[in-house]
């Protein structure tokens, strides 16, 4: 079991979540949060091919599906997180960002809160960016150097 398996097992557990049981749910609340965070509107992903790089339990995969994505490929290094993601995306895979080969076929690529957890953030960014097709969109979130606040809506 990897460190991330342990983390996701803990984070998705009843004891950790307490009153925040909906933190990783698949609901309209997640869709609205995704729209707010990305600026994507209700029809913004219609017919698009998307990638959720470092998908965790799949809350953003779900949002992309609900916003009309034709296909969402999802992967994460944690087998624990992938178990949950497969509830909404049976094709979700366990894998590392560092295994990505240049493959610019995605209209929209998301990597939320993932890149800075890798041994080489710049290389991780390059690997993820290599998946975006011409005129596609790459949306990432990384902590800044002074990250000292709780993320509102996370």
Task: List each language-model region with its residue ranges.
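Class I SAM-dependent methyltransferase SAM/SAH-binding core
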Residues: 57-98
